[in-house]
Amino acid sequence: MSTSGTFFADNSQTIGKTPLVRLNRIVKGAPATVLAKIEGRNPAYSVKCRIGAAMIWDAEQRGLLGPGKELIEPTSGNTGIALAFVAAARGIPLTLTMPETMSLERRKLLAAYGAKLVLTEGVKGMTGAVRRAEDIAASDPDRYVLLQQFRNPANPAIHEQTTGPEIWEDTGGAIDILVSGVGTGGTITGVSRYIKQTQGKPILSVAVEPEASPVISQQRSGLPLKPGPHKIQGIGAGFIPENLDLSLVDQVERVSNEEAIAYARRLAQEEGLISGISCGAAVAAAVRLAQQSEHAGKTIVVVLPDSGERYLSTALFDGIFNEQGLAVV
C-alpha cells in the first residue's frame, strides 16, 4: 500500500487498520477478555476488502491484467463487493457468479459498483458458483482472469502481512486465542501464520463453521464430507478450501443458524455493533470459549467479518422489524 503525501493513490489503498474493541455486556462477566476485530470498517465494509485489493494488485504485478482483460470470480457476496470496489477504482471490468440465495443488498451493492452479476442455483451453494465461474473463464481464456479466492496465495498472504500484525500490535502480543469464521480460510490461515510462526507464540486458533454444514470437523475426523444448507452467509462454503491450512487450526467450533442470528442481534443491541450473521457465529463461539474456566485470564480475539447493513432483507432482522411495524427493505 502506498500514499502520495497525505492522501491515498486510490481507494483500494485504504484497506486495514481496523479497530479492536472490547466486548462487554455480551460476555456476561466471563473470566476471559474478548476483543472484536471490526473488519466492517474497511473501505467496502468487510474483511474481504483486504483480499479483494491483494488479489487484484497481485494479478496486476504478474501482468495478468491489461487491455481486453476482464476479471471473473465466484462469491457469496463480500469478496465480490470487495473486488467490485477495487475494480471500479482501477478501471477493470468484473463479472461475478453468486448463489441466488445471497441477500438482496449484496446484489444491489455489486450493481452500484458496476459489476456484472451472474446468479447460480442456491441449492448448489458456493460449489455451483465456483463451477459457473470456471466455465465462463474456460469459454474465453484470453479474455477472462479467474482470481480463485479459495486457492489464491495472495489471500492468506495479505492477512499475514496486515491483519496479523495489526492484532499483534493492538494487543501488545497478549492474544491467546484467535476465533475466526472460515469462508475461504484466508483470515485464520494468514493471521495464525503471522502470530504462530513469525512471532513464535503458540496461540489457540479456533475455526468457526455452520453446525448444519460441518465439513471442517468431518475432514479433521476423517469422515466423508457432507455439506448442508445453512443461513450463515460468508462462511461454510461446503468444501475444504486450499487456502485453509488445517495444520494451523487447533479447534473447530460449530454454530447453529439460530445462535448466529441471536448473537448478531445482540452485538447490535448490547454492544452497538451492527453486524452480519457470520459475525454472530464467530462471537457465539468466542463467548462459549470465554466462559470456560480453562481460559480464565486469557485474551480472545474474534474477527467480525462485516457490517449488518447488507443483511437488512434477511432473517437476521425479520423479528426486529416485525416488532417495530417496519417492512423489510
Curated annotation (Swiss-Prot):
Single biological process term from Gene Ontology: cysteine biosynthetic process from serine
Indicate which residues the UniProt annotation says bind pyridoxal 5'-phosphate.
78, 183-187, 278
Family annotation (Gene3D superfamilies): 3.40.50.1100
The protein's required cofactor(s) are namely: pyridoxal 5'-phosphate
Q: What is its EC number?
A: 2.5.1.47
Enumerate the UniProt keywords alphabetically: Amino-acid biosynthesis, Cysteine biosynthesis, Plasmid, Pyridoxal phosphate, Transferase
Q: What induces it?
A: Transcriptionally induced in the absence of sulfur, requires CysR for transcription. Part of the srpG-srpH-srpI operon.
Pathway(s) the chain acts in: Amino-acid biosynthesis; L-cysteine biosynthesis; L-cysteine from L-serine: step 2/2
Instruction: State the Gene Ontology terms under molecular function.
Output: cysteine synthase activity
The record lists the catalysed reaction(s) as: O-acetyl-L-serine + hydrogen sulfide = L-cysteine + acetate
Q: Which family does the record assign? A: Belongs to the cysteine synthase/cystathionine beta-synthase family.
Q: What job does the chain carry out?
A: Catalyzes the conversion of O-acetylserine (OAS) to cysteine through the elimination of acetate and addition of hydrogen sulfide.
What is the name attached to this protein's record? Cysteine synthase
Q: Which organism is it from?
A: Synechococcus elongatus (strain ATCC 33912 / PCC 7942 / FACHB-805) (Anacystis nidulans R2)
